């Protein structure tokens, strides 16, 4: 057992799920860069970072896009309102670099196929579009 009370078998199962998902994503998307935890690329007009955690196992989508008309106070209020209604993810504004981001975390309790991966990703993009359109106006 580890400090998280996971058996060796469960640790291996979770690692296999995370490894399988990462390999699937690399085959499905045109990856621009990657490191030990994340894959980065462009997707539907967003900068996309997908990060993986073997321990939990989790897959985290972070979508970011530049905002050309910054209005910090108004946009922070809108982001807070969006977050009150957003169940799966969170909306944020980084006024220092002038970008909007949407972040969503998904449990990987079973291996994904391409159809399920794109369903999850495209739902995140739809929510990011909703947030971006409200914040960019």
Task: Describe the role of every protein-language-model region.
Residues 93-122, 126, 133-137:
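Well-ordered alpha/beta subsegment
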Residues 1-49, 84-94:
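Charge-rich, low-complexity N-terminal segments
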Residues 9, 13-17, 70-75, 116-123, ...:
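Short amphipathic alpha-helical segments
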Residues 50-66:
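A short acidic-to-branched-hydrophobic micro-motif
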Residues 62-103:
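Short, internal acidic amphipathic alpha-helical interface segments
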Residues 39, 57-59, 98-100:
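Hydrophobic residues embedded in beta-strands of well-ordered beta-sheets
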Residues 6, 61-68, 110-113, 117:
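Short histidine-centered catalytic/ligand-binding loop motif
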Residues 24, 78-85, 120-131:
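Conserved short hydrophobic interaction patches
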């Amino acid at each position: 057992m580890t400090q998280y009370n996971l058996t060796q078998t469960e640790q291996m199962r979770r690692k296999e799920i995370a490894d399988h998902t990462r390999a699937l994503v690399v085959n499905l998307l045109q990856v621009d860069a990657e490191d030990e935890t994340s894959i980065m690329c462009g997707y539907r007009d967003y900068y996309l970072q997908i990060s993986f955690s073997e321990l939990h196992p989790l897959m985290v989508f972070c979508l970011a896009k530049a905002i050309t008309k910054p209005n910090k106070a108004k946009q922070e209020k809108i982001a807070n309102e969006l977050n009150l209604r957003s169940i799966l993810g969170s909306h944020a504004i980084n006024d220092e670099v002038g970008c909007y981001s949407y972040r969503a975390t998904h449990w990987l309790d079973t291996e994904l196929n391409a159809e399920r991966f794109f369903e999850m990703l495209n739902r995140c993009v739809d929510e990011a579009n909703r947030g971006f359109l409200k914040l960019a106006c």
